[in-house]
């Protein structure tokens, strides 16, 4: 009788349209229930039966109901699933497979089967890549995934590397393309093999891509020649290898090993500026005035050089600081080091006055055993030899930025616009609260930004600096010239690492066009998109492998009295994120470890402070001693608490 009844259909439609709905992101918990975090900062309870239809991170719409005076939501439609492609561990029971995603809030195993073209015999504990195929909110009975790639066994010591690379869909090995033929075309090379060029790198570096030579002009000024390895002499634009390099965009440096952008034969041998080997280079010659200013005589040219010494950062630094056993092999090399040191001090002083100099932060290097175990973590402070190379490279990149801008009007530029205009008023308000007067329009100029940064660097603590950084925009890659506020420079275009950066290869080709007087095409914007995306993925991969190795390294320190000095890098709703200064690990201190009474404690991300009973106890940038409370290897989570 009620079948196909138009009145009933109309009533259903009215009820449907009157039912209130909310859109938001599902947040899972360990307890079976969940919450829907709506875009307006409000969250709604999702009871356990309804949580079975969704997954943590899903963006959904849900209907809103009231049950026992409490608002609850019932998931209705899926807008965007949290899981599409993911990595996880296999479970096998009675020949049926399921996979648990490698995510701290996804504990449920998802039924799965191997894709038709995947022939691996999956076993319990194996790691695999999977793609979601079914979802309850799409009308399916349950979740279901398809295994698209086998990664490795559960007990492989190199799990952190292989799983991370698979998670981010990054290559696991060097390109396998043979190329040894050189194509110089109309490029004429100057013979500079008699000059005392030197390379300065880490002792273990094989892909040396920059060599330096300095000459004293006798009037207080110096003439610097920067010679850069020339892979574009072997890699033609549009060739198979060029397309591979463009796709990879960068050499991927992970703890323990790297995955090169170019074949190792090129990166570590044919192009590498090895000592006493003749190599083709792209070079730049420029005068550095006594006060460190760059001359207007910038000259780019092609050349052949022969590096006379492969120097290591620590050896050069020790020698300049009059310590250690190491000595340069002869007086010519010693003179080069002295001149480079003089150049470094002049350029550093000029940049401190007229541009901006980054504060030195140490690097942390993992020392790994044969099976990927962490033997130690070494703190590598930036020393004078690192600064020599840094100042020379920055000078070289400013030269390229000027020449490409003036001759072509385009290139691959690193651009940073300082403050985000949308946040500038907030930045001014925060500065005002801390007694620093600033004008919004002035802060949006390069000079205004530099003046503020110098003022912040002179502050006794990092607190205000860390508050203000939240309002800055991100650095970008652009095909048109623009300022780099972070460096305090009018323009910046890198060309000094073409073995490991595709953008630098593009700039090499453009500089060669300037040298030979040939026409050059403006790079496509999709190149900059790929560079930005790959930089993001490579950084995430480095962080993920690091998190895994830190968890392994600190596992046996959990529950002991070993103290670590730590710096607060962030205040979150639930506690503090701190960096252990001895080894670089980022760990979490839950607020309950700081003060037991939740209502008396306020964690303010906005203010960067943690207060107890209204008194500020910790601020971002503060240091404190901590001990490791717990290490969860399966999620790579490290929990610490303040040392008593």
Curated annotation (Swiss-Prot):
It catalyses: Exonucleolytic cleavage in the 3'- to 5'-direction to yield nucleoside 5'-phosphates. Residues 189-516 form the RNB domain. GO terms for cellular component: cytosol. Keywords: Cytoplasm, Exonuclease, Hydrolase, Nuclease, RNA-binding. Residues 561-643 form the S1 motif domain. It is found in: Cytoplasm. Its main location: cytoplasm. One of its GO terms (biological process) is mRNA catabolic process. It is an enzyme of class 3 (hydrolase). GO terms for molecular function: exoribonuclease II activity; RNA binding. Its EC number is 3.1.13.1. InterPro entries: CSD (IPR011129), NA-bd_OB-fold (IPR012340), RNase_B_OB_dom (IPR013223), RNase_II (IPR011804), RNase_II/R (IPR001900), RNase_II/R_CS (IPR022966), RNase_II/RNase_R (IPR004476), RNR_Ribonuclease (IPR050180). Involved in mRNA degradation. Hydrolyzes single-stranded polyribonucleotides processively in the 3' to 5' direction. HAMAP family: RNase_II. Belongs to the RNR ribonuclease family. RNase II subfamily. This is Exoribonuclease 2. It comes from Pectobacterium atrosepticum (strain SCRI 1043 / ATCC BAA-672) (Erwinia carotovora subsp. atroseptica). The lineage of its organism: Bacteria, Pseudomonadati, Pseudomonadota, Gammaproteobacteria, Enterobacterales. The gene is rnb.
């Amino acid at each position: 009788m009620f079948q196909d009844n138009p009145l009933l259909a109309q009533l259903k439609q009215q009820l449907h349209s009157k039912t209130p709905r909310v859109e938001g992101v599902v947040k899972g918990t360990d307890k079976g229930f969940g919450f829907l975090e709506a875009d307006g900062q409000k969250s709604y309870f999702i009871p356990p039966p309804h949580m079975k239809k969704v997954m943590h991170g899903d963006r959904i719409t849900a209907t809103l109901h009231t049950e026992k005076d409490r608002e609850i939501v019932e998931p209705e439609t899926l807008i965007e699933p949290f899981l599409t492609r993911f990595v996880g561990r296999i479970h096998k029971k009675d020949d049926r497979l399921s996979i648990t995603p490698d995510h701290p809030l996804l504990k449920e195993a998802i039924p799965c089967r191997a894709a038709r073209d995947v022939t691996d015999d999956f076993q319990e504990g194996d790691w695999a890549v999977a793609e979601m195929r079914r979802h309850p909110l799409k009308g399916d009975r349950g979740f279901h995934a398809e295994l698209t790639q086998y990664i490795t066994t559960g007990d492989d010591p190199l799990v952190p590397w292989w799983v991370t690379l698979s998670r981010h869909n990054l290559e696991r090995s060097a390109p396998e393309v043979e190329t040894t033929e050189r194509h110089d075309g109309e490029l004429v090379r100057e013979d500079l093999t008699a000059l005392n060029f030197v390379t300065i790198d880490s002792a273990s570096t094989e892909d040396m891509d920059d060599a330096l030579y300095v000459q004293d002009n006798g009037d207080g000024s110096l003439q610097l020649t920067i010679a850069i390895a020339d892979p574009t002499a072997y890699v033609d634009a549009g060739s198979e290898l060029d397309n591979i390099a463009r796709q990879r965009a960068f050499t991927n440096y992970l703890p323990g090993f790297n995955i090169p952008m170019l074949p190792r034969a090129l990166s570590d041998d044919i192009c590498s500026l090895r000592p006493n080997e003749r190599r083709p280079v792209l070079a730049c010659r420029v005068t550095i005035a006594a006060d460190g200013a760059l001359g207007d005589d910038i000259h780019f040219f092609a050349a052949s050089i022969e590096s006379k010494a492969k120097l290591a950062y620590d050896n050069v630094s020790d020698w300049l600081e009059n310590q250690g056993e190491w000595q340069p092999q002869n007086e010519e090399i010693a003179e080069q080091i002295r001149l480079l040191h003089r150049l470094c001090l002049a350029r550093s002083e000029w940049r401190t006055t007229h541009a901006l100099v980054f504060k030195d932060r140490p690097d942390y290097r993992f020392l790994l055993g044969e099976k990927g175990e962490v033997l130690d973590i070494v703190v590598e402070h930036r020393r004078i030899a690192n600064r020599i190379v840094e100042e020379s490279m920055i000078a070289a990149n400013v030269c390229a930025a000027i020449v490409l801008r003036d001759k072509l009007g385009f290139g691959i530029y690193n651009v940073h616009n300082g403050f985000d205009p949308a946040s500038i008023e907030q930045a001014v308000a925060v500065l005002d609260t801390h007694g620093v007067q600033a004008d919004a329009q002035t802060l949006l100029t390069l000079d205004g930004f530099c003046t503020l940064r110098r003022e912040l660097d002179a502050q006794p603590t990092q607190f205000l600096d860390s508050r203000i950084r939240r309002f800055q925009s991100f650095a970008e890659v652009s095909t048109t010239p623009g300022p780099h506020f972070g460096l305090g420079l009018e323009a910046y275009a890198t060309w000094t690492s073409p073995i490991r950066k595709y953008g630098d290869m593009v700039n090499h080709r453009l500089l060669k066009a300037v040298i030979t007087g040939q026409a050059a095409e403006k790079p496509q914007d999709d190149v900059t998109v790929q560079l930005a995306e790959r930089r993001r993925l490579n950084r995430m991969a480095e962080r993920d492998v690091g998190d895994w190795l830190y968890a392994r390294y600190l596992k046996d320190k959990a529950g002991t009295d070993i103290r670590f000095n730590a710096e607060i890098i962030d205040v979150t709703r639930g506690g503090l994120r701190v960096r252990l200064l001895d080894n670089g690990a980022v760990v979490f201190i839950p607020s309950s470890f700081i003060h037991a009474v939740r209502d008396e404690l306020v964690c303010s991300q906005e203010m960067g402070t943690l207060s107890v009973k209204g008194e500020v106890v910790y601020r971002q940038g503060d240091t404190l001693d901590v001990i490791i409370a717990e290490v969860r290897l399966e999620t790579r989570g490290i929990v610490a608490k303040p040392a008593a």
